[in-house]
């Protein structure tokens, strides 16, 4: 029999409100709406299907305050992560958000109304306190803290929700079990004990050995329950990961394991997140939950120190084990013993026994370079999936982003680099000069700081898509502001390499060699907002390469860029 849900009752709002669906649908069509972000959609899905039981909506101020300070909802139930609906002042005013108001919650992807929230309250959180209490630090090297300060809006809206419809998914539909569906599935299979395994990474032989070992020790079955909502920036995409999990499943003894996907937006909150994960798995019917070393940790802070200790998460869940009602299965890192061809937890291996390990960094290197990945580490069918999604370095896309004053020589360098890379062959090459983008993509934009930032954001989006497709993107806007250049880097680096080339030709040289006379017009006041004349240029502090066409020619500058690309393995021939 499945584990009772957290709080005693599974808050399956989809099932609860099904008899009123048409009535709620008709009402929502007439209501003002809040369009939900990706994180809010993930949160709403787990509110609606009962994954976040005992929640029945987004937290009001009383619940939020209790969770932040004490891991407690207002009714005393344990809950460790704030589940909040953040909105801007503009949205509050436009939509008419106020206590007692009924607001539709709309899916940004297909414009469908998913639920109606009855507003309990609107409050302004202390985000510094939230960061320190929930995540243990206000350091923006933590992705959740960065999100809190730079993405989450300034006000939170609390209130219960009524379900109109479930979110629509088009990928792996057969693996997307709600808590109620998964409980029924366990019951159908006759499973009494279920060990849940949380992951946001591909699984290899060590993970299989770990989960089988946990099942054997508890005489239980295994739920592989990976997160396919939002994970840590830079993680492998969920499409690749799910194909890996599917490839791995036949390696389990028949009838031992089930794969189900969890649409969770992770916060990488370490100890607090581990408690939250345990609650979610309890709601899905699991009786046991594996908590590993540095569970849901975000890595290192801005000082190079881990945000959390390696076993802080295990300690946090153990502290609340009786109240959680789910047995924690702590585990050490598994290591391979070549002499006996087996995996064991590191704490069970004598110091004189030979062991082998491959780190995540080493695995990524081997995928990038095409080096062998041994069968003792991962199964051939898993490696095949990973290689399909991670081609060798010389088949990956990249972006070269040239920035500098008007007439600094960046356009000439970009054109010459375009010719050079096309001659090299092996991938398609796209050239996006500043003036081309202005005429084709950003013709309605002016030269205010806001419009310049929008222009760079559009360039970054196009470059990222080209990079993702394995192409070389060469872009050459003026891009005078550090913040927009950094945002461009972050956008592109989700999919491939980004190289910032500062064409540091001095302003006086660019102006002196200007044959088109644009600097003269700017000096005469005929052109306003001209970079270097009446608008600033913030020189890059983190350029990957600096060239100066007042001291070197275009051919030499291009050769320097080619050497940079070659040093990263991007131009190496197969």
Curated annotation (Swiss-Prot):
Keyword annotations for this protein?
Allosteric enzyme, Amino-acid biosynthesis, ATP-binding, Cysteine biosynthesis, Cytoplasm, Methionine biosynthesis, Nucleotide-binding, Nucleotidyltransferase, Transferase
Q: Under the GO molecular function aspect, what terms does this record hold?
A: adenylylsulfate kinase activity; ATP binding; sulfate adenylyltransferase (ATP) activity
Domain remarks in the Swiss-Prot or TrEMBL record:
The adenylyl-sulfate kinase (APS kinase) is non-functional. It is involved in allosteric regulation by PAPS. PAPS binding induces a large rotational rearrangement of domains lowering the substrate affinity of the enzyme.
Site features described as Induces change in substrate recognition on ATP binding, chain residue numbers: 331
Q: Which organism is it from?
A: Phaeosphaeria nodorum (strain SN15 / ATCC MYA-4574 / FGSC 10173)
The record's region (N-terminal) falls at 1-170
Q: What segment(s) does the record annotate as region Allosteric regulation domain?
A: 396-574
Amino acids binding ATP: 198-201, 292-295, 334
Q: What is this protein called?
A: Sulfate adenylyltransferase
For whether the record's keyword set contains Nucleotide-binding, the answer is: yes
**Binding annotation for 3'-phosphoadenylyl sulfate:** 435-438, 452, 478-479, 516
This enzyme's EC code(s): 2.7.7.4
Region spans: Catalytic: 171-395
What positions constitute the catalytic site? 199, 200, 201
Which residues does this entry assign to the site Transition state stabilizer?
A: 204, 207
- Tell me which GO cellular component terms the UniProt record holds: cytoplasm
Q: How does it assemble?
A: Homohexamer. Dimer of trimers.
């Amino acid at each position: 029999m499945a584990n009772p849900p957290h709080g005693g009752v599974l808050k399956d709002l989809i099932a609860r409100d099904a008899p009123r669906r048409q009535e709620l649908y008709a009402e929502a069509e007439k209501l003002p709406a809040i369009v939900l972000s990706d994180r809010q959609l993930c949160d709403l899905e787990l509110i609606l299907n009962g994954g976040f039981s005992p929640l029945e909506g987004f937290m009001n101020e009383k619940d939020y305050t209790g969770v932040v300070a004490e891991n407690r909802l207002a009714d005393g139930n344990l809950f460790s992560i704030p589940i909040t609906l953040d909105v801007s002042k503009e949205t509050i005013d436009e939509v008419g958000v106020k206590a007692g108001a009924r607001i539709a919650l709309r899916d940004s992807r297909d414009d469908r109304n998913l639920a109606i929230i009855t507003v309990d309250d609107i409050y302004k959180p202390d985000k510094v306190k939230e960061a320190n209490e929930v995540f243990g630090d206000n350091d923006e090297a933590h992705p959740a803290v960065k999100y809190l300060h730079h993405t989450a809006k300034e006000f939170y809206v609390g209130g219960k929700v009524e379900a109109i419809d479930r979110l629509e998914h088009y990928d792996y539909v057969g693996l997307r079990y709600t808590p109620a569906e998964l409980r029924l599935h366990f019951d159908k299979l006759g499973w009494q004990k279920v060990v849940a395994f949380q992951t946001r990474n591909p699984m290899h032989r060590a993970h299989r050995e770990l989960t089988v070992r946990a099942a054997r020790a508890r005489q239980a079955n295994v739920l592989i329950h990976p997160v396919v909502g939002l994970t840590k920036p830079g993680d492998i995409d969920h499409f690749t990961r799910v194909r890996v999990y599917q490839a791995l499943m036949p390696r389990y003894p028949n009838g031992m394991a089930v794969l189900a996907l969890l649409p969770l937006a992770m916060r990488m909150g370490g100890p607090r997140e581990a408690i939250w994960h345990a609650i979610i798995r309890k709601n899905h019917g699991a009786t046991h939950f594996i908590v590993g070393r540095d569970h849901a940790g975000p890595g290192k802070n801005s000082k190079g120190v881990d945000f959390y200790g390696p076993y802080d998460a295990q300690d946090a869940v153990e502290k609340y084990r009786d109240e959680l009602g789910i047995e924690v299965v702590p585990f050490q890192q598994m290591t391979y013993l070549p002499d006996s061809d087996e995996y064991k937890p590191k704490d069970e291996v004598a110091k004189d026994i030979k062991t082998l390990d491959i780190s995540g960094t080493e695995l990524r290197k081997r995928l990038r370079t095409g080096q062998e990945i041994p069968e003792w580490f991962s199964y051939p069918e898993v490696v095949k999936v990973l290689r399909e999604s991670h081609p060798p370095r010389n088949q990956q896309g990249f972006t070269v982003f040239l920035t500098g004053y008007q007439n600094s020589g960046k356009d000439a360098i970009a054109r010459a680099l375009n010719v050079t890379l096309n001659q090299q062959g092996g991938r398609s090459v796209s050239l996006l000069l500043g003036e081309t983008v202005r005429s084709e993509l950003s013709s309605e934009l002016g030269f205010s700081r806001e419009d310049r930032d929008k222009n760079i954001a559009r360039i970054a989006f196009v470059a990222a898509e080209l990079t993702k497709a394995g192409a070389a993107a060469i872009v050459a806007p003026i891009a005078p502001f550090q913040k927009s250049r950094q945002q461009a880097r972050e956008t592109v680096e989700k999919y491939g390499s980004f190289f910032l080339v500062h064409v540091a030709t001095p302003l006086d040289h660019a102006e002196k060699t200007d044959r088109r006379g644009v600097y003269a017009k700017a000096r005469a006041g005929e052109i306003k907002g001209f970079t270097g004349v009446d608008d600033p240029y913030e020189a890059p502090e983190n350029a990957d390469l600096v060239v100066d066409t007042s001291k070197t020619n275009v051919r030499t500058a291009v050769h320097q860029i080619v050497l940079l690309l070659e040093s990263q393995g991007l131009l190496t021939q197969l």
